[in-house]
């Protein structure tokens, strides 16, 4: 998952910039310039972001910033624990499996190969907490389901006042991932793009726009991160009643609001993966554990050897490239003198 894709900002695009960017521009404008008469070239140290700005950075861009969905879920987690403590609710039979000397329980989900079903459950739960604990109802017309319906069925009048249940969000996302044959990594990147959109455009995901925002994030993540490219017309065949023109328009607005920043560093991806696992533990959505058998141990060993061989090959290629860069530096060997 070390691959990163970046894109330049369109000169004609005019997405709404967040407050952090305005403060960053003020900081750069106040940078001292040398009194030399020659042309001034800004040093890389002059472009470093101050600590107070780095701490307020968007979590979808910087690994040190905490994810938004995890902080929004903590309120419900604390209330649930407090209610159980006051009402003396017993946890009942412990369903969590623990390893012992004779048996080791492991799940089949890793940061590089997450479990698809469990990951989609966690991602949709994060979206559920985003909707439930939203600050307001800031939205745009392009994401309004009443103005741009996804089906021919009439949208209820109270659609903007009823929060969707977790099962409804999971069913919607699961249908798209199953039909388009998307991977679990794509689900994590979908959540990254979703939180980046909410931060950059200063929006809230709410009952009136959650389907189109999630669809736009999945559409973009599948094109950037999935090995098999999914076209907009493919989603039109899945949703049946949506038009290609509507999909193209929504994708264009989504990219503009992201300021064409589709880069997801490996550290940010890993942070979202482990925060999703924490969210699963807090909500009793633990990943399925199975005892370690000889067959699974051999499979893990084979995967480890495959990764090890791949990294060895990459290091050899990098070493050969460095030696053959300009034919000036090579490996020098000296004869040993034995006495």
Swiss-Prot record:
GO biological process, one term: nervous system development
Principal subcellular localisation of the protein: membrane
UniProt subcellular location: Cell membrane
UniProt keyword Cell membrane, yes or no: yes
Stretches assigned to the Cyclin N-terminal domain: 181-263
GO CC, any one term: plasma membrane
InterPro entries xref list: Cyclin-like_dom (IPR013763), Cyclin-like_sf (IPR036915), Cyclin_N (IPR006671), Cyclin_Y (IPR012399)
Origin: domain of life: Eukaryota
Signal peptide residue numbers: none
Keywords: Cell membrane, Cyclin, Membrane, Neurogenesis
SMART domains, alphabetized: CYCLIN
UniProt-listed SUPFAM superfamilies: Cyclin-like
A GO molecular-function descriptor: protein kinase binding
Family affiliation: Belongs to the cyclin family. Cyclin Y subfamily.
Xref: PANTHER family: CYCLIN Y, ISOFORM A
Task performed by this protein: Key regulator of Wnt signaling implicated in various biological processes such as embryonic neurogenesis.
Protein name per Swiss-Prot or TrEMBL: Cyclin-Y-like protein 1
Gene it is expressed from: ccnyl1
């Amino acid at each position: 998952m070390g691959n990163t894709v970046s894109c330049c900002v369109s000169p004609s695009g005019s997405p709404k910039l967040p407050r952090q960017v305005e403060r960053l521009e003020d900081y750069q404008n106040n940078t001292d310039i040398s009194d030399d008469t020659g042309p001034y070239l800004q040093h890389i140290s002059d472009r470093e972001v101050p600590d107070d700005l780095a701490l307020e950075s968007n979590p979808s861009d910087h690994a040190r910033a905490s994810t938004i969905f995890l902080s929004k879920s903590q309120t419900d987690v604390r209330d649930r624990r407090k209610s159980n403590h006051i009402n003396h609710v017993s946890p009942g039979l412990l369903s969590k499996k623990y390893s012992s000397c004779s048996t080791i329980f492991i799940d089949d989900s890793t940061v590089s190969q997450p479990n698809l079903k469990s990951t989609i459950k966690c991602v949709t739960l994060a979206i559920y907490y985003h909707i439930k604990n939203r600050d307001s109802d800031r939205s745009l017309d392009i994401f309004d389901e009443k103005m741009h319906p996804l089906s021919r069925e009439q949208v209820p009048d109270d659609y903007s006042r009823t929060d969707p249940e977790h099962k409804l969000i999971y069913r919607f996302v699961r249908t798209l991932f199953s039909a388009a044959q998307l991977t679990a990594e794509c689900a994590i990147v979908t959540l990254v793009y979703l939180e980046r959109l909410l931060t950059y455009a200063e929006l809230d995901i709410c009952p009136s726009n959650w389907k189109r925002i999630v669809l736009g994030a999945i559409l973009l993540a599948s094109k950037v991160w999935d090995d098999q490219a999914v076209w907009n017309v493919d989603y039109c065949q899945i949703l049946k009643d949506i038009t290609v023109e509507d999909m193209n328009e929504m994708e264009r607005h989504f990219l503009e609001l992201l300021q064409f920043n589709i880069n997801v560093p490996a550290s940010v991806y890993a942070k979202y993966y482990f925060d999703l696992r924490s969210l699963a533990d807090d909500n009793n959505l633990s990943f399925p554990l199975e005892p370690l058998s000889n067959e699974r141990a051999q499979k893990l060993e084979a995967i480890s050897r495959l990764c090890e061989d791949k990294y060895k090959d990459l290091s050899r290629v990098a070493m050969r490239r460095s030696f053959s860069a300009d034919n000036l530096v090579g490996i020098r060997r000296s004869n040993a003198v034995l006495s």
